[in-house]
Amino acid sequence: VLEAFTASGDPARWVILPGPATAVMARYARELGESLGGREIEPQSVWCSWYSYYEGISQEALEREIPQVAELGFKTLQIDDGWEVAVGDWEAGESFGDGMEAAATRIREAGMQPGLWVAPFIALPGSRAVRDYPEMFVHNADGGLAVAGSNWGGDYYALDTTHPPAHTYVRKLIAKSVHRWGFSYLKLDFINAAAIPGYRHRQIDREEAYRTGLRLVRDTAGDETFLLGSGALIMPSIGLLDAVRVG
């Protein structure tokens, strides 16, 4: 192990491992897991609504699918994007008239783990989060909100995970999803937005800003909640997420 430094000048380590490529990578994976506290979780069989309904998932569609998905032997049924009012307004939309707690209960009563899609580190311009609390998002040098990407027909902004109001926002979203509604599996999407370049409340490494956000999620959700990262930074997620979508 050699001493090294990151781009910001902070100390780091280089690891030199001799041997065939596959053996080296296997050992490197073990070393990373041990260093960062990697989580060892049994693989899950998950049915995700996205690939059948995209944003068209609804309470009625869910009720049709639940018995079929259970019969096929899936352990988890995860509701994907489309359930919410808007990205940044994390309440049940019109298509889930009975609410998300009722949806989680129906999935659980069918013998499966209820899962939910959320994008905790981004919000759309028209959302209440952006309108009411613009200070909790990453900014540009000119003081405007930094664009993290484009989807849903327009740009979206990235949460500043170093800012105390953003901490409150994330904790409320995760606590509601897990402890009030009863979802014990979360698909966390677009989470690389936490690491975009820009001006933050505290100027820390972008990787640390990302891990700060994930720590908020993990600490609030608890160790028993399965966290899947989508659009995730793979190595910085070790020790905080249970799995990462790579396809």
What do the predicted segments below correspond to?
Residues 1-72, 76:
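Carbohydrate-recognition beta-sandwich/jelly-roll modules
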Residues 73-247:
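Aromatic- and carboxylate-enriched substrate-binding clefts and catalytic-loop regions
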